[in-house]
Amino acid sequence: MLAVRLRSTKKGKIRFASHRDIAKVWERTLRISNIPLMYSQGFSPRPKISYGLALPTGAESDCEYIDLQVDDSNRESINVEEICTSLNDNLPPGILINGVSVMNGKFPSLQQTVTSCIWDITVNEDDTKVDSWVDRINNENTIVLRRERKGKEV
């Protein structure tokens, strides 16, 4: 088994696809590209793929991660660069693999690896208004977020 971590972009119209839709895109693209994946055991075997943090629908990203468990038992060697080329040829517009690494030994999951995210947000207001919002929030001791979930405020 060869553990491969891919880094990709998600830009353009594909940003409106949900996390689950993107997962289906990856599974289909891996199947079309004939990448030999490891599968789970049981009644409904699934490819062993791990996804990074779910990106909100509508957001673009330069740095999305996915871990693959590639079955290398029937091949003498697998070239990860060939995997990237094959996947990039079959991925939909807006998704592009821009990095790959082979994970050796025991390594932390994607969820454990991500310690921070950087967000670039465009606000359609003038700079002085946005600056006053930021100053007001930065001067608060605590920030309370209220939202409604299942008809109740949480």
Model-predicted segments: where are they?
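Extended, well-folded interaction surfaces typified by the phenylalanyl-tRNA synthetase beta subunit core
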Residues: L2, R7-T9, K13, A17, ...
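Broad gene-expression machinery/nucleic-acid interaction feature
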Residues: A3, C63-D67, S116-D120
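Short beta-strand-to-loop capping motifs
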Residues: S8, L68-N74, I121-E125
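Short, solvent-exposed beta-strand/turn "edge" segments of beta-rich domains on protein surfaces
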Residues: F16, G58-A59, L110-Q112
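Short, well-structured beta-strand/strand-turn elements
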Residues: S33-S40, N98
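Short, charge-patterned binding micro-sites
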Residues: M38-D72
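Internal, well-folded beta-alpha domain core
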Residues: S77-V154
